[in-house]
């Protein structure tokens, strides 16, 4: 799970199914994780006001809200690109966070070469294997390469690129020959290839065609780790995620289900609130 930390006002626990349960004080029950509700400020502007963000491990969540609500800022807080004036970010221990690089790849590197190079451990081990002379170290290198399934990496990188629209010949062309949109697809392929424990996506379909979008939907549905995604693509949010996190006026509300379910539930909630006034 991931949680924003700032000025604590309440404790919230997650049960094994990812349901939120309030506890004012004390340790969480056995088998539960703890997240906390905090206020978070960035450049003096309140992004979260006594709001909870807790994404259980392995869940796929769409982050929605009006333009300017702070969705992209929230992602940047999680990645560490921004630091809150008041508060901090905590992430599950040893969890790798992945997000698409803002700078599109260029130069002479091919798409498949760029994607493979994203796995710096694999690249480093392969380089060392060419020059290592100590038998023990050579054995360690080959064992580690086996552990990370390094020999299957080229085929996996090629499959991801193919899903995003690159045929076998295009995968070998220099990145400089592609338009900015296609180069952003390479950047997306690289982060998908890495399979981080927390995958952050900000409008990933902006540079995809219909075929690429449909492929991404299927890929995200079977992605083995946590996904937090900002998107205005209603179909994507209906088919690729299992929950919607709504950011409004500094408050975060988690809704189970896709975007249509979120809208229906939110309308009913607003109707009941008006009725009670």
Where are these regions (language model features)?
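ABC ATP-binding cassette signature C-motif
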Residues: 45-274
């Amino acid at each position: 799970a991931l949680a924003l930390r700032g000025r604590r006002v309440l404790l919230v626990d997650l049960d094994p199914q990812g349901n939120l349960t309030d506890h004012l004080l004390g340790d969480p029950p056995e088998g539960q994780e703890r997240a906390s509700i905090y206020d978070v400020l960035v450049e003096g502007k309140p992004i979260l006001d006594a709001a909870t963000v807790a994404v259980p491990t392995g869940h796929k969540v769409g982050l929605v809200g009006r333009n300017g609500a702070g969705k992209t800022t929230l992602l940047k807080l999680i990645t560490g690109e921004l630091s809150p004036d008041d508060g901090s970010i905590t992430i599950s221990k040893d969890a790798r966070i992945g997000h698409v690089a803002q700078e599109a790849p260029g130069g002479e590197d091919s798409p498949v070469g760029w994607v493979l190079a994203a796995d710096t451990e694999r690249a480093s081990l392969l380089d060392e294997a060419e020059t290592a002379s100590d038998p023990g170290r050579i054995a360690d290198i080959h064992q580690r390469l086996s552990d990370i399934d390094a020999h299957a990496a080229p085929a996996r990188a090629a499959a991801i690129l193919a899903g995003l629209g690159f045929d076998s010949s295009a995968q070998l062309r220099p990145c400089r020959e592609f338009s900015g949109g296609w180069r952003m697809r390479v950047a997306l392929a690289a982060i998908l290839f890495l399979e981080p424990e927390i995958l952050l996506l900000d409008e990933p379909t902006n540079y995809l065609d219909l075929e690429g979008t449909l492929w991404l939907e299927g890929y995200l549905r079977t992605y083995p780790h946590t996904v937090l995604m900002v998107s205005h693509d209603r179909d994507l949010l209906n088919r690729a995620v299992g929950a919607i996190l709504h950011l409004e006026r500094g408050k975060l509300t988690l809704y189970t289900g896709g975007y249509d379910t979120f809208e229906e539930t939110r309308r009913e909630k607003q109707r009941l609130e008006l009725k009670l006034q």
